[in-house]
Amino acid sequence: MSDYEFDVFISYRREGNPYNWVRNHFHPRLTDCLADHLPDEPTVFIDETMEVGSIWPDRLEEALGRTRILVPVLSPQYFRSRWCLAEWHSMVERERLLGQAGLIYPVLFSDSENFPSFARERSWRDLKKWNKPDLVFQQTVRWIDFVEEIENVAIELARLLGKVPPWEPGWPMRRPDPPMPGMTPVPRF
């Protein structure tokens, strides 16, 4: 392969409300709306599309390296994930090497008061008022506003996608540091 594989890589924590919101609302609506604004069918990476048997750290790294724009879904859970942070910092490093911002398009799911300074310094699209994860949200009046807002996100992403430089092999990739010995996370019941 010698080109981008994905237009957008949705980076999110696979737990709780952000996970359900991405799966139920954000990913499908964004993909549909992007299709209305791109010359070709949009390609949106979400880790749920990985093939069974994939070695997921390798596949995440490969997908991110072949993605034009990272769309992190910001929440407190996001910044507690070593993998989410590795995805974010990989794309920050690419922006630095290229001398070009706009390869990270953050969307705010919740909070923001307790984010690390590197995240608070970056502007984001605030989607907090539509952060309802359950499918019943699609039956509410606010759903129409959400769809209109995602349409605006798609328009902005389409504009940014047109500015992404050509793909290069060897983009910098960060993997999270392994947990410290004896620091194995305790399962929550």
Predicted regions, residues:
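Structural alpha-helical scaffold elements that stabilize or flank donor/cofactor-binding regions
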Residues: 63-64
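C-terminal interaction surface of TIR/SEFIR-family domains
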Residues: 1-35, 56, 101-189
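Active-site-adjacent loop/helix micro-motif of nuclease/hydrolase catalytic cores
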Residues: 19-20, 55-56, 79-85
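An anion/phosphate-binding loop that grips the pyrophosphate of nucleotide cofactors and donors
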Residues: 67
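Hydrophobic acceptor-binding patch used for acceptor engagement in glycosyltransferases
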Residues: 70-71
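Conserved TIR/SEFIR loop-to-helix hotspot centered on a Trp-containing motif
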Residues: 76-97
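Conserved RecA-like helicase motor-core motifs
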Residues: 34-47
